[in-house]
């Protein structure tokens, strides 16, 4: 997914801006640090989760080992308390804190992470 694809999907979702933020690779694409991401990962508030869980049929069996709900091949979400959101307020959408992404990538240290580490 390139930046246009990500922004189009976010627009279609039409989630309230203050109830979610864009995670990891997709946030790097929006920032212009990376050209593409495999999918869009979002952290959403418990309040937003309660509003959308029936629409997207979000049941525990749709969670992966990292507690992300798989909605489709392009979108996964994880739920957190708004008070614990680790984000940077940005336009047009809030993004995961860059230092958090960098720390995660340094710890995981896959080949694709090494490329991102140099660019961040």
Which positions does each model-derived feature cover?
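Compositionally biased terminal segments of proteins
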Residues: 1-120
């Amino acid at each position: 997914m390139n930046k246009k694809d990500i922004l189009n999907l976010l627009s279609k979702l039409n989630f309230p801006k203050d109830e979610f933020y864009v995670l990891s690779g997709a946030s790097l694409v929006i920032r212009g640090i990376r050209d593409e991401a495999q999918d869009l990962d979002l952290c959403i508030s418990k309040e937003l989760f309660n509003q959308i869980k029936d629409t997207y049929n979000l049941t525990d069996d749709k969670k992966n080992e990292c507690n992300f709900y798989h909605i489709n091949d392009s979108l996964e979400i994880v739920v957190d308390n708004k008070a614990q959101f680790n984000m940077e307020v940005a336009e047009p959408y809030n993004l995961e804190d860059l230092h958090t992404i960098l720390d995660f990538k340094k710890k995981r240290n896959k080949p694709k992470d090494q490329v991102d580490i140099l660019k961040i």
